[in-house]
Amino acid sequence: MAKSLRSKWKRKMRAEKRKKNAPKELARLKTVLAKGSNVLMDDVKEIATVVPAKKINEKMDLDVDAPEGESSKMDTELKRNKKNLRDQHGQYPVWFNQRQQKKLKSQCGKKKGKSKQAKKLAW
């Protein structure tokens, strides 16, 4: 689709607005950083638990070192039929819409008959 004049104009105006407000935004960010370095984390500790970055990194390293089969494998009890994508209860996946189900059922239904031999060429 082509870009409309309205969208081009809006994009242009947003760019000009960003250019105009850039110095104010930079000053605001600097003040936030300056305040942040002096303030203790006591206020934040009441709201959420503060965990040092080292502990998180160590935990991530342990997960990476673990064998692939143990940590990354999901516990799925449902077994799907690869041919028709139904699970053991006859349900299709959530992402499989009605049209796709109908098409798949019709394709599976066609194949149930007796197979015929190919016609031979008459020379």
From Swiss-Prot:
Region (Disordered): 1-22, 61-123
Keywords assigned by UniProt, alphabetized: Chromosome, Nucleus
Gene Ontology BP annotations: dendrite extension; positive regulation of dendritic spine development
Biased composition regions of type Basic residues, renumbered to the chain: 1-21, 100-123
Gene Ontology CC terms, in alphabetical order: chromosome; nucleolus
Predominant localisation class: nucleus
InterPro entries, per the entry: LLPH-like
Superkingdom: Eukaryota
Pfam families documented for this protein: LLPH
Basic and acidic residues bias spans: 70-89
GO function terms (MF aspect): basal RNA polymerase II transcription machinery binding; RNA binding
Cellular location(s): Nucleus, Nucleolus; Chromosome
Similarity-based family: Belongs to the learning-associated protein family.
Function: Regulates dendritic and spine growth and synaptic transmission.
Protein name listed in UniProt: Protein LLP homolog
Primary gene name: llph
